[in-house]
């Protein structure tokens, strides 16, 4: 089964909220279209970046439908407490023309049971056999999918074509050594912004699900291009990729923490996107010090454009990180 939908840059879409704290579907679609127009290969919706625990199942599926009808290639997240609900999201994804599944482990109930997780994964994969899927591995879920479980599932479900790793460098290295290097058709995805270089250069990752890419798509796409060239042995690209990784570091670290959605929505507002001013829980907000910190870090990353309200002017500094 074709796994190319999981390659390249793939932002995990955030769900914009209206002033009454309901989903702004028009804003969601616009952001998805803008990111694809910028060069992203696909988008993920609805994952943790999309605030899936704060949305109803109907709201999540309405967002998926709106994106697919607008021609945005969507990888659908199956996060749910109940396996039946996860299966319903997978079935809906296939029905409306989504391009792939990001299969999330069973949560809260029997989450540490390998047998329960095996049954959970199998139910989702069998619900949408026409969609290529990756298993999402993350320490936040309290369960680690190892090679034995992955290949037990792959032997039964040909639509399981890859592995997304949100853990750190060691977890990515394990996935490369024991899972995705077994078969060249399997795709490894870097699931956190801080591990993109390690994932691409040292582990053979071919895709990155990104948070900061929602805010700085051109810069992140260039970073991915450099990482890909570095993985092919280009020393100049390797040096430029490391420089850009360091410049992006703090903005990327936001992707690792519990306030990632608050930070990236705030960065979008600073960059002029008013669709992201509101949150679903009115009490969800960054502290004053967090906001100032985010402002300072964005300014630091944008040496050629000190004002907020517009993206970084790359053309005024053509040698910056190897940009042409």
Where are these regions (language model features)?
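Structured C-terminal cap/extension of enzyme domains
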Residues: 198-324
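Catalytic alpha/beta core domains of metabolic enzymes, predominantly
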Residues: 123-128, 138-257
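A general structural signal for well-ordered alpha-helical segments in protein cores
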Residues: 28, 60, 64, 86, ...
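Short alpha-helix boundary/capping motifs
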Residues: 63-64, 71, 95-96, 121-122, ...
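Active-site beta->alpha loop and helix N-cap motifs at the rims of alpha/beta catalytic domains
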Residues: 2-144
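A broad structural signal for alpha-helix termini and local helix breaks/kinks
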Residues: 71, 128, 157, 271-272
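Short glycine-rich loop/turn motifs that provide flexible caps or phosphate-binding loops at active sites
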Residues: 7, 46-49, 76-78, 161, ...
